[in-house]
Amino acid sequence: MARVTVEDCLEHVDNRFELVMLSTKRARQLATGGKEPLVQWENDKPTVVALREIAEGLMSYEFIANAEIVEDEPLFAAFEDESNEAV
């Protein structure tokens, strides 16, 4: 298991608060199985893997933001069709 320090992560993130938010979102993605890790898992917890990705410069807010965009237009279109039929 590679040791990750806050200082290693802060080389790629502006401040500690941003580091907390970024690592939390990424760890949640990894824990729920929605995304594959960008580093070797090595039997670590999702939080450690997220921090290792940040420390290696593989993770950024742009990456998280692009991953969170969901195309929801068809869902709303179906809902609107159902509500129009009920009227």
Swiss-Prot record:
<comment type="function">
    <text>Promotes RNA polymerase assembly. Latches the N- and C-terminal regions of the beta' subunit thereby facilitating its interaction with the beta and alpha subunits.</text>
</comment>
<dbReference type="GO" id="GO:0000428">
    <property type="term" value="C:DNA-directed RNA polymerase complex"/>
</dbReference>
<dbReference type="InterPro" id="IPR036161">
    <property type="entry name" value="RPB6/omega-like_sf"/>
</dbReference>
<comment type="similarity">
    <text>Belongs to the RNA polymerase subunit omega family.</text>
</comment>
<keyword id="KW-0804">Transcription</keyword>
<dbReference type="InterPro" id="IPR003716">
    <property type="entry name" value="DNA-dir_RNA_pol_omega"/>
</dbReference>
<dbReference type="Pfam" id="PF01192">
    <property type="entry name" value="RNA_pol_Rpb6"/>
</dbReference>
<comment type="subunit">
    <text>The RNAP catalytic core consists of 2 alpha, 1 beta, 1 beta' and 1 omega subunit. When a sigma factor is associated with the core the holoenzyme is formed, which can initiate transcription.</text>
</comment>
<keyword id="KW-0548">Nucleotidyltransferase</keyword>
<keyword id="KW-0240">DNA-directed RNA polymerase</keyword>
<dbReference type="InterPro" id="IPR006110">
    <property type="entry name" value="Pol_omega/Rpo6/RPB6"/>
</dbReference>
<protein>
    <recommendedName>
        <fullName>DNA-directed RNA polymerase subunit omega</fullName>
        <ecNumber>2.7.7.6</ecNumber>
    </recommendedName>
</protein>
<dbReference type="GO" id="GO:0003677">
    <property type="term" value="F:DNA binding"/>
</dbReference>
<dbReference type="GO" id="GO:0006351">
    <property type="term" value="P:DNA-templated transcription"/>
</dbReference>
<keyword id="KW-0808">Transferase</keyword>
<dbReference type="GO" id="GO:0003899">
    <property type="term" value="F:DNA-directed RNA polymerase activity"/>
</dbReference>
